[in-house]
Swiss-Prot record:
Name of the protein in question: Major prion protein
Listed InterPro entries: Prion (IPR000817), Prion/Doppel_b-ribbon_dom_sf (IPR036924), Prion/Doppel_prot_b-ribbon_dom (IPR022416), Prion_copper_b_octapeptide (IPR020949), Prion_N (IPR025860)
Organism: Trachypithecus francoisi
Positions of Sequence repeats: 51-59, 60-67, 68-75, 76-83, 84-91
Lipid attachment locations (GPI-anchor amidated serine): 230
Residues involved in Cu(2+) 2 binding: 69-71
Length: 253
């Protein structure tokens, strides 16, 4: 994880360093940049070959070559190249400027990542979250009757679990115990409201199924919590902070 972060940071520094240097390079002069490419050909008073009637060669009204009304090359009314009425590039009259439009708000990547990792918070359950749907595990109960009963009724059992963040528990057993109790309670209440009742066999099987899913949820949440902690430690180290400050200097400067 640390090696990958270092390589990503090095690549980021190299990219922005090149962009920062490009921003500070002066723009070279060229065709139609306003300055003369042949300064020795002009006289102090103006053109070496002054036009008759005030215009240049092929200039009937004082514009440049091919300029009928004093605009630049291909400019019929004095605007920039491709500007028919004097506006900016691609702007017809300059009255529809896009510069004053407010920028759209950006969603914080940190908030998006946190929401995706933590799951959806369930209202009215005191901070419990609902995990993503899982495939119900294949469990053997030790006899043919219960195994067959489970296969025939597994669709009636939960495929999602309720849980709290792993940092609120001291160990896996406490997390799993709380996860099993709240999940079975919520599923039983919801299903009973719909007119369906559970037998003792159903409750026994639900406990086994939900326990396996809660263990899977704990492992998933623990891994995500560890990765978030490692990222915070990496980006809070002094060398990384110094490099980020240098990148900001290049971008702003």
């Amino acid at each position: 994880m640390a090696n990958l972060g270092c390589w990503m940071l090095v690549l980021f520094v190299a990219t922005w360093s090149d962009l920062g240097l490009c921003k500070k390079r002066p723009k070279p002069g060229g065709w139609n940049t306003g300055g003369s490419r042949y300064p020795g050909q002009g006289s102090p008073g103006g053109n070496r070959y002054p036009p008759q009637g005030g215009g240049g060669w092929g200039q009937p009204h004082g514009g440049g070559w091919g300029q009928p009304h004093g605009g630049g090359w291909g400019q019929p009314h004095g605007g920039g190249w491709g500007q028919p009425h004097g506006g900016g590039w691609g702007q017809g009259g300059g009255t529809h400027s896009q510069w004053n439009k407010p920028s759209k708000p950006k969603t914080s990547m940190k908030h998006m990542a946190g929401a995706a990792a933590a799951g959806a918070v369930v209202g009215g359950l005191g901070g419990y979250m609902l995990g993503s749907a899982m495939s119900r595990p294949l469990i053997h109960f030790g006899n043919d009757y219960e195994d067959r009963y489970y296969r025939e009724n597994m669709y009636r059992y939960p495929n999602q679990v309720y849980y709290r963040p792993v940092d609120q528990y001291s160990n896996q057993n406490n997390f799993v115990h709380d996860c099993v109790n709240i999940t079975i309670k919520q599923h039983t209440v919801t299903t009973t409201t719909k007119g369906e009742n559970f037998t003792e066999t159903d409750v026994k099987m639900m406990e086994r199924v939900v326990e396996q899913m809660c263990i899977t949820q704990y492992e998933k949440e623990s891994q995500a919590y560890y990765q978030r902690g490692s990222s915070m430690v990496f980006f809070s180290s002094p060398p990384v902070i110094l490099l980020i400050s240098f990148l900001i200097f290049l971008i702003v400067g």
